């Protein structure tokens, strides 16, 4: 199943990786150079990053599991007490296997992997897939967390969970966090998310995720939603966990959409 073609500026600022190498990598994922795009995928010496060239103050979007907010969250966050950990059913020694079907920048998946869950990632947008792949490859080399991530966090080479076979590719939990339109002028829309949303947009076909998720999940499907969003597929969950700005809708076992 090929990605639909994405046009974006491709730029190399790296002394080691050439523009030709970046173009070749992107071509494998149906990403082509479009010099008129306000978005750019940039290869630096350190990482692959996404920039919105007409709004440089927004900064670059990239995946970093080793430093920054993820390091702080791993060392000082709530761990098993985090809302996402409770939502997927981590309790005592129970560590469910998880498919994160809307991986994005991998943050919730990283939290679960750091606790000890085996997490498989699926990402539908090819640019985000490459950012995630780049971040994982760098993190796998890290002395402190590389071995743990190689064991617990893997990016699957599929675009949609409907490509997975429920008879062999199942997991205890399927986690869904589809992009949802933010309220107009919301102060909560971070700079990084504005760049991300310009690339990805709202997940208009998010409802199509629920049925294959229910078929793959042995124990539960967890759907993260803004507190003002309707239920995915219009389907009432068995129960919900509410946080300050979000809720986790939980569908148990063999529910059907």
From Swiss-Prot:
Disulfide bonds: none annotated. Keywords: Cytoplasm, Methyltransferase, rRNA processing, S-adenosyl-L-methionine, Transferase. GO terms for molecular function: 16S rRNA (guanine(1516)-N(2))-methyltransferase activity. Its main location: cytoplasm. Its EC number is 2.1.1.242. It is an enzyme of class 2 (transferase). HAMAP family: 16SrRNA_methyltr_J (MF_01523). This is Ribosomal RNA small subunit methyltransferase J.
């Amino acid at each position: 199943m090929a990605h639909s073609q994405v046009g974006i500026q491709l730029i190399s600022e790296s002394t080691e990786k050439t523009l030709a190498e970046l173009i070749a990598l992107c071509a494998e994922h149906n990403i082509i150079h479009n010099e008129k795009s306000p978005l750019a995928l940039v290869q630096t010496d350190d990482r692959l990053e996404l920039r919105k060239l007409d709004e440089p103050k927004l900064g670059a979007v990239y995946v970093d599991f080793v430093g920054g907010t993820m390091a702080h969250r791993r060392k000082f966050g709530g761990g098993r007490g985090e809302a996402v950990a409770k939502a997927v059913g981590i309790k005592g020694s129970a560590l469910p296997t998880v498919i994160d079907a809307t991986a994005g920048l991998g943050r919730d998946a990283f939290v679960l992997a750091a606790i000890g869950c085996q997490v498989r990632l699926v990402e539908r947008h090819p640019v985000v897939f490459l950012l995630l792949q780049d971040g994982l490859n760098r993190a796998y080399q890290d002395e402190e967390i590389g071995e743990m991530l190689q064991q617990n966090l893997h990016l699957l080479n599929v675009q949609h969970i409907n490509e997975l076979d429920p008879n062999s590719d199942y997991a205890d939990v399927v986690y869904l966090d589809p992009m949802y339109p933010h309220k107009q002028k919301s102060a909560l829309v971070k700079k990084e998310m504005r760049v991300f949303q310009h690339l990805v947009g709202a997940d208009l076909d998010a409802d199509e995720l629920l049925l294959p998720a229910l078929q793959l999940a042995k124990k539960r499907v967890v759907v993260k939603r803004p507190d003002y969003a309707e239920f995915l597929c219009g389907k009432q969950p068995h129960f919900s966990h509410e946080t300050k700005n979000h809720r986790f809708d939980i569908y148990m076992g063999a529910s059907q959409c």
